[in-house]
Swiss-Prot record:
This is Histidine ammonia-lyase. It is found in: Cytoplasm. GO terms for biological process: L-histidine catabolic process to glutamate and formamide; L-histidine catabolic process to glutamate and formate. Pathway: Amino-acid degradation; L-histidine degradation into L-glutamate; N-formimidoyl-L-glutamate from L-histidine: step 1/3. Keywords: Cytoplasm, Histidine metabolism, Lyase. It is an enzyme of class 4 (lyase). It comes from Streptococcus gordonii (strain Challis / ATCC 35105 / BCRC 15272 / CH1 / DL1 / V288). Its EC number is 4.3.1.3.
């Protein structure tokens, strides 16, 4: 990707984060932002020269804030900070999450409130642009005082320490720098703190989950519409007149999406044609999907505020004042990311119930478990079990992390957000729910092929079905088949941009009215 994103600390969007994290877009620092960074750094240099007492510059950290540090030890203080705070556990964060984290940290620093040298910010940018991805363990952050442990792991390779990925290989930090042609740096006063004190990790993980959730909301409407085709669903519950008298934005958008997807369908019905009403999982798609749309739209606004915010401490104002506060605290994002997890979980829950309706012969009027010879073959029986397992796991994961707190740092940091846990849970719920929705689409396409009378599909459901069938075949269970391979193909297809693009080329889909 040749697109270069200008970083000024003010205008970064969620789409920019995706472009950098997943599609290799490069970045540059805005010229005015460079001036702001340099002005802020001059104030820190003055503080050190004048031997003023400022937290994290000439003092220790956390409950050690009353320990004074001499000017000659300020550099060692910062390196010690990184070495001791790099205390994470677990598997590495995905590379796209780490790239998002690096980008968001740079964008925060270039606002010019952190007192970091421009050359240090440019070094982190060089790692990002040249594809050096620090090894960051996924666990170990309380979400206040920021994401200290994981961000310390981000900084290690800048010093020639730790580990990093480069061109798909996990290398020592120094080896990764050497292969990328990057020189290591030594940190100056306040720089270690400026690099690791903030909500960047939870925001990076949560930003990717938020973007993916928006795509999943559209996919869930496609899945619901395909289920409507199978069940000869009644279309009156999606009429605009019904929803304008309860003008919830997500509800209105969902009803419109379903109308667009089903336009021209020969399978849908009107009330009393086959039955008076449909079950809630079909009839209430606008209300259920719409509620999640509204929740996720709210989270997106919070994300776009946070990725353009300063979450450092202390901060240095444009007038030269040093303010020690709490912008590092993750609570403003912990609660939204818990909300995000709940909203995504509901999408998985309702999709799993529609999978059950598709495979249940009493409800679908099709062969049991969508197989031509039920009994000899079990068809989609255990596929529904697997979806139920994921949905139930989501219900456990949806328990809010932000309602918990464990005091730390000798009770100096006595109330923490657990926001990084909230973001990681939301990302896991997203993966589970996306699998369920992919299975609903697969089961609906199988069911459509089994229907004795199958009429023309709708304007949006037809391209969805056609593309799906190009990648995932109708399953003849009498022949040699391992169903998990087809399930994986289905998941890979809907995770790609190709599937949703094919539908959106035919009809407009949105998450807000």
């Amino acid at each position: 990707m040749t697109h270069v994103i200008n970083l000024d600390g003010e205008h970064l969007t969620l789409e920019d984060v995706i472009a950098v994290a997943r599609h290799g877009a490069t970045c540059e620092i805005d010229q005015e932002a460079k001036k702001a960074v340099e002005a802020s750094r001059k104030i820190v240099d003055d503080i050190v020269r004048e031997k003023r007492v400022v937290y994290g510059v000439t003092t220790g950290f956390g409950s050690l804030c009353n320990v004074s540090i001499s000017p000659e030890d300020t550099t060692q203080l910062q390196e010690n900070l990184i070495r001791t705070h790099a205390s994470g556990f677990g598997d590495p964060l995905p590379e796209d999450a780490v790239r998002a984290i690096m980008l968001i940290r740079i964008n925060s620093l270039v606002k010019g409130y952190s007192g970091i040298r421009l050359s240090t910010v440019e070094k982190l940018l060089e790692l990002l642009n040249k594809g050096v991805v620090p090894f960051i363990p996924e666990k170990g952050s309380l979400g206040a005082s920021g994401d200290l442990a994981p961000l310390a792991h981000m900084v290690l390779p800048m010093l020639g320490l730790g580990h990093a990925y480069y061109q798909g290989q996990l290398l020592s930090g120094q080896e990764a720098l050497d292969k990328a042609g990057i020189e290591k740096i030594a940190l100056a006063a306040k720089e270690g703190l400026a690099l690791i004190n903030g909500t960047t990790v939870l925001t990076g993980i949560g930003a990717l989950a938020t973007y993916d959730a928006i795509q999943l909301l559209k996919l869930s409407d496609v899945a619901g519409a395909l289920s409507m085709e199978v069940h000869n669903g009644i279309t009156s519950p999606f009429e605009e007149d019904l929803h304008t008298i309860r003008p919830q934005s997500g509800q209105l958008a969902t009803a419109r999406n379903i109308r667009n997807l089903l336009e021209g369908s020969g399978n849908t019905t009107v009330a009393t044609q086959q039955r008076v009403q449909d079950p809630y999982t079909l009839r209430c798609i606008p209300q259920i999907h719409g509620a999640s749309k509204d929740s996720i739209a709210y989270v997106k606004t919070k994300v776009e505020i946070e990725i353009n915010s300063v979450t450092d401490n202390p901060i240095i104002t444009k007038e030269g004042h040093v303010i020690s506060g709490g912008n590092f605290h993750g609570e403003p994002m912990a609660q939204p990311f818990d909300f995000l997890g709940i909203a995504i979980s509901e999408i998985g829950n309702v999709s799993e119930r529609r999978v059950e309706r598709l495979v249940n012969s009493q409800l679908s009027k099709l062969p049991s478990f969508l197989v031509k010879h039920p009994g000899l073959n079990s068809g989609f029986m255990i596929t529904q079990y697997a979806c139920a397992s994921l949905a139930s796991e989501n219900k456990v994961l949806a328990h809010p992390a932000s309602v918990d707190s464990i005091p730390s740092c000798e009770n100096q940091e006595d109330f923490v957000s657990m926001g990084t846990t909230a973001a990681r849970k939301a990302a896991e719920i997203l993966k589970n729910s996306r699998r369920i929705v992919a299975t609903e689409i697969m089961a609906a396409c199988q069911a459509l092929d089994l229907k004795p009378e199958n009429h023309e599909l709708g304007k949006g459901t037809k391209p969805a079905y056609d593309l799906f069938r190009q990648h995932v075949r109708f399953i003849e269970f009498d022949k040699d088949i391992e169903i998990y391979e087809e399930l994986n193909k289905a998941s890979e297809l809907i995770e790609s941009d190709e599937f949703l693009a094919a539908v959106e080329n035919a009809v407009d889909l949105s998450i807000q009215f």
